[in-house]
């Protein structure tokens, strides 16, 4: 004799299926709400890590100066790079060289500080395709590079940092796609806050932190600076001309100051 399920049991099973669908829908809604929050949390964590990296590098740089009669490690010597090497020019197999750099003894061998954790760059060169770069930080070219922009201060010692002052002179930053050697070249010959029409510079800063970049300063502090001109984050070529770009003006204002001595 065939047995039939009771109406009550069928109703219970149908209700359980509906409950399951409701739970799935709720989970989907919660996930949709959490994913942006998790993304923002990741951005914040990367910012903090990058600021910590630039701060560690700058403190090492300051201790180096203290050990050498205030003489700072300059923009040429702080990072020995053979830019002709097809791998080194994108710093993709450079870890073995990072441990040899002059600041490394002050960093306890922690080569991770040379890279921004948000730097997504990977090599496209034959033999290295897909290999992540291992360095994204460069130094302000006005630390020791004598022939860059005539008429502007070059800093050799910490005591030279009179203008714009240690708190307003950057040492390290995240460099963008223009990265090659250890220097970040800012052209001061177009620096005039009253004339923004001819803004031009050599190297480009990175936008790795949600359209912002990490900077450290000669007083030892680090900060994340938000770019205000959308062209800054979209720049793929260099040297870089960008009329009326307030971001170039800001970087220039933190790079050097007009020398009070007459140029020869």
Question: What is each of the regions a protein language model found here?
Answer:
Residues 6, 14, 73-77:
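Short hydrophobic/aromatic-rich motifs at helix boundaries and adjacent loops
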Residues 48-264:
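Short, well-structured segments within or immediately adjacent to enzyme catalytic domains
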Residues 1-2:
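N-terminal hydrophobic targeting signals that begin at the initiator methionine
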Residues 7, 11-52:
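Amphipathic alpha-helical segments typified by the pilin-like N-terminal helix
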């Amino acid at each position: 004799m065939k047995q039939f399920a009771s109406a009550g049991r069928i109703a219970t099973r149908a209700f359980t299926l509906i409950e399951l669908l409701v739970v799935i829908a709720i989970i989907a809604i919660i996930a949709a709400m959490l994913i942006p929050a998790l993304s923002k949390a990741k951005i914040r964590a990367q910012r903090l890590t990058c600021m910590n990296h630039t701060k560690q590098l700058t403190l090492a740089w300051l201790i180096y100066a203290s050990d050498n009669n205030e003489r700072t490690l300059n923009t040429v010597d702080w990072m020995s790079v053979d830019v002709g090497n097809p791998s080194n020019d994108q710093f993709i197999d450079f870890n073995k060289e990072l441990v040899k750099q002059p600041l490394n003894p002050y960093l306890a061998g922690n080569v991770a500080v040379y890279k921004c954790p948000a730097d997504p760059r990977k090599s496209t060169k034959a033999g290295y395709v897909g290999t992540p770069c291992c360095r994204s930080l460069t130094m302000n070219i006005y630390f020791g590079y004598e022939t860059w922009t005539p008429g502007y201060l070059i800093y050799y010692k910490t005591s030279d940092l009179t203008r714009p002052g240690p708190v307003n002179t950057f040492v390290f930053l995240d460099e963008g796609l223009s990265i090659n050697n250890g220097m970040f070249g800012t052209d001061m010959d177009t620096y005039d806050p009253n004339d923004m029409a001819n803004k031009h510079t050599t190297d480009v800063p990175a936008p790795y932190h949600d359209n912002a970049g990490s900077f450290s300063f000669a007083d030892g502090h680090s900060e994340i600076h938000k770019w205000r001109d959308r062209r800054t984050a979209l720049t793929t070529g260099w040297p870089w001309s960008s009329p009326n770009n307030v971001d170039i003006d800001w970087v220039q204002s933190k790079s050097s100051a007009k020398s009070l001595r007459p140029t020869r």
